[in-house]
């Protein structure tokens, strides 16, 4: 497996010199900051104080899902390349520290509920007055304005409001969520785009009146980031009154493009030797994977006058029924599927030839997508009959030879064993402080001259508190006093003149 040595501080990234304050927690804000840090930004993560040895305080994500040595392994992905400053933002002394850090920062990222920053006396407009070049990224469920601004918002709720949840289901069944936090991640990536745009504007706005350029506030709403990816949903409704409904594994309006069951069954075991496996045991104290808290109550009510699920743009495209030629599966086993995208006109003909149905490929009524959509059930059934007689590997080999886009539905075991993932550096091996090795996703995107790099492992809570505060001019005695009063944490007895405790500016 390809590995990325960790850490490697000698290579400067494209964002080297960019100073970022991250005041977020959980996913959206921290993911945005992590993306900037991967490409060289100097990121200080501010999180609630506590006792790192006892596992108290800090970003709640430190305790999410499976834990190793008391800390989530997800933490090693979400907080790599960052520094940790443990600070109680409710305290006036902590708020003053944030103002001092903001005065020397380029970017501040926060994802609290609207009004929280203002309640701490840290309103973005006031911070920008102190530092006119400061860029503030604000991520929230519903945005900083509008009638819903004060509602609490998780990514899962944003996915529902943004239109995604309605589409992720089998026709006529309960909508299901995507298996990861797409709403948060999409908002984070939109936020990163906003930061880069604001940096470009700051550079372009340099003038005698603004010698360092002008900063600004970026307002990202989780639901809007989801809605921005909803393709033609709104114009179809505007032009035709069409409400797209769930289509299961099919791609609505495109044929054929679906998941088809094969002869073999799905396994969670690696497909080949050399896959990435955990070298250390998972904490038994962690219990089952810790799920994200679900919104209270049942289904979200629709506004009065909203269009019901019965409205539809044409006939629903059903997922193909199990084919007659498949072998019976063992009780509790899961069938293995392949995704086949034969929706190009010439691709469709090659696909039909490969599955032994050249008659469908030669049918003039199926020569284009519009005709195929009308008969999608017939086409899916023909493909499903063929895939059910073969294993996934046989199907993929045949379609690859025919030039038909297709792929297996990967489990993480498949990913960990896949040579393409390995060749692209997407299976990074991180050496932990205890000497163990942890596999984490590599960095994207891939830049030819200035690629991202894993420079630092994720910090322990307050690991950099002393050094950061020394950089602001505080003495070791003053810093210890802040810790004694519960305002900061992470300060350990050390020689103040040592490299690890000597101050460094933001």
List each model region and its residues:
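A glycine-rich dinucleotide-binding beta-alpha-beta segment and adjacent secondary-structure elements
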Residues: 401-455
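Long, intrinsically disordered low-complexity tandem-repeat segments
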Residues: 270-333
